[in-house]
Amino acid sequence: MIVGRPKAAVARDHVRRVNRWTDIAAVQADLEELPPGIFAGLDAAVLALDSLGARFIGTRLFLTARVPHVDAGVLADHWHARATVSAAVPDGACQVDTWSGTQLARAGEDVGMPCVAAETGDGAPSTLAMGHAAAALAAHELLALTGAIADRPRIGEELRLDLRRGRYDAFRLPLAAACAADHVLAAGRVERLDPSCLQASLGALMSTCGAGADTSVVLATRAVVALAVCEACGESTGPYLLASALETCPACGMRLASLRRVRRLRWGEAAPTVARRAASAWFRAGDAFALVPATEPARATLFAFPPPPLQWEPGAPWDGAAERFARLPKSFDLRRIRTLRIGVLGAGHLGAALIEQLAPLPWQGMLIVDRDVVEARNVASHSLAARLEEAAG
């Protein structure tokens, strides 16, 4: 029975049916629940997501993990398939560089303005033709990013295929002076932290890492509440805790409501409130944060906690299986493909179309992430679910 199964598991089963050599990891989770360390071993990845919020978090995850990636999607009203290519470097543009304040607000980000149209996470309307065209653009750029083919990846560009007019365009993305995705996460050296640091106090951790009062702390994906107000007495406070961990009002003991959430803060502002709390109040295994000195912002350092182990389903031994790929185009580097681990975030209609195109190649590993399950209304138009249901009889 396909209905009710996680989309990530459906995608995994399809990959295994057509490819018995690749290691596969299928994860059912919301991206905000995953630390960036999970993705650190990938050579390249694709964001195949509808939600602006999920795309924003995915971009920050890949910048922190230093994973080159493609953001694929459709502009349904214009019949455009699109793909944006990012090298995950501090001085290279990503898709978020072009987002307006309204788009960031719709993504659920705190930009200091109310947004009555914040996204719910539901998919955007499109057609299968658009999805498959966007998947083709993304698959080609993924192959180029990894060096699996000799083509030059279009890093820092957005590619668009107009299905109505049959026109293909590419344009270079502008590099914003201060991208909301915080490219500083991809800058500087990486310092690996011991797991025991999660049990230390935030003050001790920041002191060990060299943070001063004027140092900026940039959190990878989690946001802390910098300003909250009591729903009863109206007293305001700066708790600097996760929204899910807000405590009661210090004045009257009633519930606090979040007013301002931040991922970048000055340590001197937060320290008086949270320095004595455990580092786990902000961080988890696999998490990361950047410290940016006030006097030398170009000398940022990323500090990373070791990630929890990812459960890979091992593929079959390669042995002499190369003969099966004798008809692969000569432009494909089969030996290199066997060394590469890739990721696909999103296994809905677009992700399914992408996985169909990538699954037959004998990658070393493929990580698939999606939070949703297959619904009855999805089966007919979800290519992988329809195939598996047909195979099941």
Predicted regions and their residues:
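A short, basic/flexible loop-to-alpha-helix module at the beginning of a structural domain
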Residues: 36, 124, 313-342, 349
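A glycine-biased structural micro-motif
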Residues: 4-5, 155-158, 339, 389-390
